[in-house]
């Protein structure tokens, strides 16, 4: 079994059991954002977390074991994404990436925002013109060092 197959199985079982990502996050004991990333193959679960979600989704032992192996992170295809929702994030970075970079450098200096020491919160924001998606990302600033 490959890690991609585990992800497919998780999605299938989630649908079959009519569970939400938030419900599965409760089983794992982490945020819905981190837990969803983990179940979609981008994070490593502890043994207890993998066994808990494995029980909830009736996953085979091989899948539970693979959930505990550090994944190849950022493993989406390198071509421009075709999924409309994912493409909007690509577009967002294409349009605002240089702005993010300029403002972060002006505020913090030369460095990067960590995606390792990182938090994200996704919520629905009611709006009379149509509900909005609110995503708050918080990453530790890591300055480049001189040597």
From Swiss-Prot:
One of its GO terms (molecular function) is cyanate hydratase activity. It comes from the Bacteria. The active site is at residues 88, 91, 114. Keywords: Lyase. It catalyses: cyanate + hydrogencarbonate + 3 H(+) = NH4(+) + 2 CO2. The keyword Lyase applies. GO terms for biological process: cyanate metabolic process. Gene3D superfamilies: Cyanate lyase, C-terminal domain (3.30.1160.10), lambda repressor-like DNA-binding domains (1.10.260.40). It holds the Pfam family CYNS_N. The keyword Lyase applies. Its EC number is 4.2.1.104. InterPro entries: Cyanase (IPR008076), Cyanate_lyase_C (IPR003712), Cyanate_lyase_C_sf (IPR036581), CYNS_N (IPR048564), Lambda_DNA-bd_dom_sf (IPR010982). It is an enzyme of class 4 (lyase). Belongs to the cyanase family. Catalyzes the reaction of cyanate with bicarbonate to produce ammonia and carbon dioxide. This is Cyanate hydratase. It comes from Ralstonia pickettii (strain 12J). The gene is cynS.
